[in-house]
Swiss-Prot record:
Main location: cytoplasm
PANTHER family: ELONGATION FACTOR TS, ELONGATION FACTOR TS, MITOCHONDRIAL
Top-level taxon: Bacteria
Keywords: Cytoplasm, Elongation factor, Protein biosynthesis
One annotated Gene Ontology cellular component of this protein: cytoplasm
Organism lineage: Bacteria, Pseudomonadati, Chlamydiota, Chlamydiia, Chlamydiales
Gene name as annotated: tsf
One Gene Ontology molecular-function label: translation elongation factor activity
Function comment: Associates with the EF-Tu.GDP complex and induces the exchange of GDP to GTP. It remains bound to the aminoacyl-tRNA.EF-Tu.GTP complex up to the GTP hydrolysis stage on the ribosome.
Pfam families in UniProt: EF_TS
UniProt source species: Chlamydia caviae (strain ATCC VR-813 / DSM 19441 / 03DC25 / GPIC)
InterPro entries per record: EF-Ts_dimer_sf (IPR036402), Transl_elong_EFTs/EF1B (IPR001816), Transl_elong_EFTs/EF1B_dimer (IPR014039), Transl_elong_Ts_CS (IPR018101), UBA-like_sf (IPR009060)
Name used for this protein in its record: Elongation factor Ts
Region of interest (Involved in Mg(2+) ion dislocation from EF-Tu), residue spans: 80-83
PROSITE patterns listed in its UniProt record: EF_TS_1, EF_TS_2
Length: 282
């Protein structure tokens, strides 16, 4: 005969998210004591998590949030797409976003030993281990990003494919252009720019592009070569620089043109301060 009630079993499952059989075993081991059973399962979780750490994690989700505390972006990987869409896993990821906003940290190593916002009795790494036990797969917090936010900034977030790709755009100079920032973020996910503007293209990347173009126009007069290089570089900048790209929702205007229009209508100098584009595994 069991030494615990069905109500205790139900509470243990609710508190830990662990399966029925393991909860029964834990309560039997702890003589029906709920608190001890919770601790027992957490210890088991830490032990079983270490056995899963070597497994590949190619699936996952990217999540982001922006509020008065700042902007946080996290990428968390698991083994299968099935678990990537699991409610327990998604709750863990959402909690991580809150943790980054609360602690204002910018590295995974700095985040892991901090107290979890989801369970004050656990560190974030310990909660990761407990969640691994619940979902049965390795969980890896791959990268995090925290951006402070001023009162004169607008932040727009766009998520594609249920968190497979996420973009964040920060506009400086104005606090009420979240819709524009989100439109630009949507454009970024579709167009995938590498740099903000011409000036941010690394010199070595620019030289490589010039060499490629030059090799294609050998034998022509230098004046012709220079004109061709100039034209092709313009196309190159349109391909890789956000501000040079034609807006995906209205190709008649560039992203720079959108920002310039925002400056005119707001009476402030609006600029794209920063953008982020993360894709799972990239």
């Amino acid at each position: 005969m069991s030494n615990f009630s069905m109500e205790t079993l139900k509470l243990l499952r609710q508190q830990t998210g662990v399966g029925l059989t393991k909860c029964k075993e834990a309560l039997a081991e702890c003589n029906g004591n709920l608190e001890e059973a919770v601790v027992h399962l957490r210890k088991l979780g830490l032990a079983s998590a270490s056995k899963k750490e070597h497994r590949e994690t190619k699936e996952g989700v990217i999540a982001a949030k922006s509020d008065a505390r700042g902007t946080a972006v996290v990428e968390v990987n698991v083994e299968t797409d099935f678990v990537a869409n699991n409610a327990v896993f998604r709750t863990f990821v959402d909690g991580l976003v809150e943790d980054v906003l609360n602690h204002k940290v910018n590295s995974v190593d700095a985040l892991l030993p901090l107290t979890s916002s989801q369970d004050a009795s656990l560190t974030i790494d310990e909660l990761r281990a407990v969640t691994m036990q619940t979902v049965g797969e390795n969980i890896r917090i791959s990268r995090i990003k925290y951006l402070p936010k001023t009162t004169e900034e607008s932040v727009g977030i766009y998520s594609h494919g249920n968190g497979k790709a996420v973009s964040v755009t920060v506009l400086s100079g104005v606090a009420d252009k979240e819709s524009l920032a989100k439109d630009i973020s949507m454009h970024i996910v579709a167009a995938q720019p590498l740099f903000l503007n011409k000036e941010s293209v690394p010199a070595d990347a620019l030289e490589r592009e010039k060499e490629v173009i030059s090799s294609q126009v050998q034998g022509k007069p230098q004046a012709v070569i220079d004109k061709i290089i100039s034209g092709k570089l313009g196309t190159f900048f349109q391909d890789v620089c956000l501000l040079e790209q034609a807006f995906i929702k209205n190709p008649d205007i560039t992203i720079q043109g959108l920002v310039d229009d925002a400056s005119k209508t707001s009476g402030n100098s609006v600029e794209v301060k920063e953008f982020i584009l993360w894709k799972i595994g990239a």
